């Protein structure tokens, strides 16, 4: 039929099918037998019944049909056939449609011609025709299933029709053009479905359907947490475990969990099996008694989990212990930190009697042997309640172990905090006799020293862009970069102190707690942190592992060595933000800031300015008089500045500023006062300089009201300073009035200069003021 493509199924043949090749059934069977005896073949138009369909092998390329499997295989091996034009796979847009149904005709309730769906296959059919036709290695195996599948359609879109030239063959087609495509499913000699794009094999067609999605560019499964998209739902599930840290695949030998089954498989196939790793690792068991298992879990056994950490025996590593019931539900989770104790060290748990001394017995001998082996090996056992409740107190050391409901002995109990404290205390007693030749750090064993030395020679591809320090791992570089972060964004809720990271805040919050869970095993003194307890314990051992490279002095802490080295190098990294002074230690900087008078930034600046004073300050320091300058309200509110200079000390002067009746210390020269209101000289001003006495001050008050006139009354000894002050104040049209000292002369000398002219007008010959290029300059000339 036109506009629709045929759907037919040719089943795979086995040895039994070849044995029945001579069976005759109707007209089609006779024709098949004749073809077999003569070695010929049957053409496509030859009619055959549905029963003979199992005995016919059709070439998918040239559409030639064979009744003998050997002839069909020989035909495929020769590769001499050509594609039949009438049966060629479509090259129309229909070949690009998505395929998702495999349909086989079978006898159903509706009749023998009604098809049923047995599998779903979704593929991109763009290049399947060429890929399928060029697979002689798979086709030549003789086990072929040719399936022409159609795109998924609604029930009303499918109709039955007869193919041209084959009235007895039932075909299934779609009404719309471009809605189906031909796909051959090849089955290898093991009976597995073969993907024609990557040649992977699968057990069923449904698995092949799920696999074919990976060859598509569509990503319909999106993660709701981060927005990443994936082609398959399984990929999304595996990705989601990275957010939840779910590890459903657990090794039955060592208890280690993995996110993916492939990771567990690689773990089991590793060069060093996990059973060997247990002998060199630190183990700890967490057991749940039968009476403590929640309802619904198995009550016949005690659920135990053994966690081990592969690596150096003396290296402390965090271990996560999970207690699960029979269904795999997590009952309790304990975080501990274990370290292997040296030989001869006292065990942490009370000595347990041997198996023959146990008063109770159990039917399960294997379980008893397990408990006995665990106790003899020194493994700490902990019984944890099913709820997240506090641990029960441990039984006294002299008491015999009680029996559980199933007859097994009850496990001795220890709190996790007690385990950490005692292990850390006893680990601190181990002498460190193996120093590193490249740095000053020492180690207790040769194995830990070798592991440390590998860090010196390992490649360091991750380099800090700020200081150039290199690291072998990316997470070490990220942790190091916190040193260069000066911003402190994390605040302690108790005292308000700021820290760079939230981990520092958590460690600091122990200071506000009264709990001291880490006692010294030698003197019993308790500490809030394990590090403080370890540092204190070194005082009993007189151990100083950190040695100075300059003077060979030893220190118990690395920080003490760093502070000591600064005395050799002169480094002072702690700077005062006020005065810029550097200090070698942070505590010294804090004491500097907490001094009674505070940081003397202003006093130090005053001393520096007096060492190299300006010309105006020099003139002012040489004159013993006091000058009062009043700024007019034209610029701002009336402010009074008094600059005093004592006659005894002519080199240094103490400045006093009076602002609205309040007296404070200011700089010693008047230029800092004037420069705040005057920057540029303006045109159109008249300047009057007059030497007056104290009696003439009132007469000058009327002249001070003019905005374009500046009147200055000054003694003759301060003429040069007044000229400099006048040059600074001319641009604003400010009125300045200065009181003269008691030693001023009564004779007045007035000099008037127009700022628009460069011509100098002299009346007294003592002061010359010029205005070149619009900028007013005031110069004094001694006549």
Swiss-Prot record:
Pathway: Protein modification; protein ubiquitination. The keyword Nucleus applies. A zinc finger (C2H2-type) spans 193-215, 221-243, 249-273, 434-456, 462-484, 490-512, 518-540, 546-568, 574-596. Its EC number is 2.3.2.27. Phosphorylated; phosphorylation is cell cycle-dependent and regulates DNA-binding activity and function. May be sumoylated by UBE2I upon interaction with CDKN2A. Its main location: nucleus. SUPFAM superfamilies: beta-beta-alpha zinc fingers. It is found in: Nucleus, Nucleoplasm; Cytoplasm. The modification Phosphoserine is found at residue 49. PROSITE patterns: ZINC_FINGER_C2H2_1, ZINC_FINGER_C2H2_2. Residues 40-84 are annotated as: Required for ubiquitin ligase activity. InterPro entries: Znf_C2H2_sf (IPR036236), Znf_C2H2_type (IPR013087). Residues 386-407 are annotated as: Disordered. Disruption phenotype: Death before 7.5 dpc probably at the peri-implantation stage. Blastocysts display defects in mitotic progression and chromosomal segregation and increased apoptosis. The keyword Cytoplasm applies. GO terms for molecular function: cAMP response element binding; DNA binding; DNA-binding transcription activator activity, RNA polymerase II-specific; DNA-binding transcription repressor activity, RNA polymerase II-specific; RNA polymerase II-specific DNA-binding transcription factor binding; transferase activity; zinc ion binding. GO terms for biological process: cell division; DNA replication; positive regulation of transcription by RNA polymerase II; protein ubiquitination; regulation of cell cycle process; regulation of DNA-templated transcription; regulation of mitotic cell cycle, embryonic. Residues 434-598 are annotated as: Interaction with BMI1. It catalyses: S-ubiquitinyl-[E2 ubiquitin-conjugating enzyme]-L-cysteine + [acceptor protein]-L-lysine = [E2 ubiquitin-conjugating enzyme]-L-cysteine + N(6)-ubiquitinyl-[acceptor protein]-L-lysine. Homodimer; binds DNA as a dimer. Forms a complex with CDKN2A and TP53. Interacts with HDAC1, HMGA2 and RASSF1. Interactions with TP53, RB1, ANP32A and probably BMI1 and FHL2 regulate E4F1 activity. May function as a transcriptional repressor. May also function as a ubiquitin ligase mediating ubiquitination of chromatin-associated TP53. Functions in cell survival and proliferation through control of the cell cycle. Functions in the p53 and pRB tumor suppressor pathways and regulates the cyclin CCNA2 transcription. This is Transcription factor E4F1. It comes from Mus musculus (Mouse). The lineage of its organism: Eukaryota, Metazoa, Chordata, Craniata, Vertebrata. The gene is E4f1.
